[in-house]
Design a protein with these regions (language model features):
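Conserved SAM-binding loop
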Residues: 84-85
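S-adenosyl-L-methionine
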Residues: 1-44
């Protein structure tokens, strides 16, 4: 799969220096890495995916194209949010299944139908905790099976999930050969049951 096949433009890595301790730089998950993820993990047909720090929306377009899933991309930066909306306009698939929301991740109101939450090292542990707390609050109000997908996770994020939440690890695998040089080049998948 490529941007051209989808009618979108997501090939960009943030190099402007505006990333910070709390919000890490934008970099899309490569199509090869997405293929690896979905080789090991198959979402349910009624899953709704939320991509926190979605940038230009690559994951959202990918899951709609491959699985016909609904998704929401949460993006703080105006520039990326605007370009994600532009990508939605030019996308060759079902635009109606893709939503973008501009807000801070910790302020995003999790909908009762959202079940899978994707994180590509988007922000600091202090913000991550707040996001997870909102997800857990939604789960308490509307019990359902939830899945967290962490790509390129920092140690403090993994520790927090495993020691301070009820999510249980159900899958961990390398995202490619790069894991030999950087152990963060992996996926950690967690589930919270009813």
């Amino acid at each position: 799969m490529t941007d051209k096949e989808l009618g979108i433009h997501t090939e960009e890595v943030q190099i402007d220096g505006t990333d910070s301790f709390h919000c890490h730089r934008y970099e899309p998950t490569s199509y090869e890495v997405l293929e690896e993820l979905f080789y090991h993990y198959t979402p349910m047909e009624n899953d709704v995916i939320v991509d926190y720090g979605c940038g230009l929306g690559r994951l959202n377009f990918y899951v709609e194209n491959r699985f016909s899933l609904m998704s929401t991309g949460v993006e703080l930066t105006d520039r990326y949010y605007t370009r994600a909306l532009r990508n939605r306009e030019t996308y060759l698939g079902d635009k109606e299944k893709i939503t973008f929301v501009q807000c801070a991740a910790q302020n995003y109101e999790v909908s009762p139908n959202e079940t899978v939450f994707y994180f590509f090292n988007p922000f600091s542990i202090s913000i991550f905790r707040q996001v997870i707390n909102r997800i857990l609050l939604s789960w308490q109000e509307h019990p359902r099976v939830l899945t967290l997908i962490l790509y390129y996770p920092e140690d403090d994020v993994v520790f927090y999930i495993e020691q301070h939440t009820s999510f249980a690890l159900f899958g961990e695998f390398a995202s490619g050969e790069e894991v030999k040089c950087d152990r963060r080049e992996r996926f950690c998948l967690y589930r919270l049951d009813i």
